[in-house]
Amino acid sequence: STLITLNTIAHHHHSMLQSSTSFQDLWLVLFDHTKIREDLKRTVNLGPFKEKIDDGLPIRKAAYTCILTMLTTMPSHVDVNRFASYLASGLAERESDVKMLCYHIMTKICAMVNARDVLMPVLDDLMVPLARTINKRLDKVLKTKANEASIQRVRQLLFSAVRAVESL
C-alpha cells in the first residue's frame, strides 16, 4: 500500500517528491521492489495439481507503476541511466502485466530527449526478452484453442511490444 500511496503522490503532488532531499533514495527503494523475491513465492496444493503463487507480483507491479508515473509527471527529475538494467529484468518476467508496464516505460524513455542513448548500450539485453515474448505468445495462440479473452490479452501484449520496438 505504500507504493500505491507513493504513486498517488507522484501523480497528484509530484512537487512534494521533487523537493524532498531523499528523492534519489526513493529510486533505490523502487528499484529494489522490482526484483523477484523467491521468499515471496509459495506452492499451493489443489488436489492432484500444484500451483505456484507469486505474492511479490503486486509489489513489483506497483513499483513499475510508480516508475512510469514519475517518468510521466516529472521527467526532468528522473535519471533514466539508473534503471535500464531493471527494465531488462522486467521484460524477462513471465507475467504479462509487468511486461506491459516495462514496454510502456521503454516507450516513455525513448520519447525523452537523448534517452535513446541510454537504451542503446543495453539494447541486446532488451531485445532478447522482447523477441522471446513475441515468438512465445504468437506460438501459444496459434497452437492452442485459446478463448477470446486470452487472445485479446496476447494481442495487447504483442501490440505493446511492437510499439516499444518502434519507439527505439
Q: Where does each model-flagged region fall?
A:
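Acidic, Ser/Thr- and Gly/Pro-rich intrinsically disordered linkers and low-complexity segments
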Residues: 33-59, 134-159
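Alpha-helical rod/repeat scaffolding segments in eukaryotic adaptors/tethers
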Residues: 14-16, 49, 112-116, 120, ...
